Regions:
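Binding-interface segments
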Residues: 120
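Membrane-proximal linker segments that couple transmembrane helices to downstream signaling/catalytic modules
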Residues: 6-107, 112, 123-126, 133-134, ...
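Short, small-residue-biased leader/transition segments that mark boundaries at the very start
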Residues: 1-3
Length: 154
């Protein structure tokens, strides 16, 4: 009438018995999370002369591993495309913000981490199909139209 012993041996963590590919996947997910926190919280992409080496050092991993994460796990062609994506997303938010309508495009570009206007304009147009000025005009006009619609319906 004794109860059966369900766990005769100490339970090993699941990771210990996982295949190496699964362990690598878990490690990669943790590194991607840490990388995205650096990008979102610290906005490391804004720093002058940020390199894959400086970022790898911050994450305490070799450069080749960070390069593989950016290329294979996140799907970016290279480190610069990855950085510029974050810079452009910040610039798009600033350009669409009516409170920043008078801020010069060059200021927004530099604040986002670009070193000069030319590379910013090229990267921005490649990403959005619009120049930064066209993007700003459309974004703010769209918000104004949305606000007018809300005012009419309210």
């Amino acid at each position: 009438d004794a109860l059966p012993i369900l766990f005769a041996a100490p339970v090993e963590p699941v990771v210990a018995n996982a295949p190496p590919a699964a362990i690598e996947e878990i490690a990669d997910q943790k590194l991607v999370s840490a990388l995205m926190r650096l990008m979102a919280d610290e906005r490391i992409y804004r720093q002058d002369n940020v390199t894959i080496g400086t970022l790898a050092t911050r994450l305490k991993i070799p450069e080749y591993r960070l390069r593989r994460l950016i290329n294979q796990r996140l799907g970016y062609r290279n480190f610069n495309v990855f950085l510029n994506n974050h810079r452009i997303e910040e610039a798009k938010a600033a350009l669409a913000d009516p409170a920043q309508a008078e801020v010069p495009v060059i200021t927004i570009a530099m604040d986002a981490g670009f070193q000069s206007l030319g590379p910013f304009n090229r990267a921005f147009k490649a990403d959005t199909g619009l120049t930064p000025t066209e993007f700003r005009r459309q974004a703010i006009a769209g918000q104004t139209a949305d606000a007018a619609e809300i005012a009419r319906s309210g």
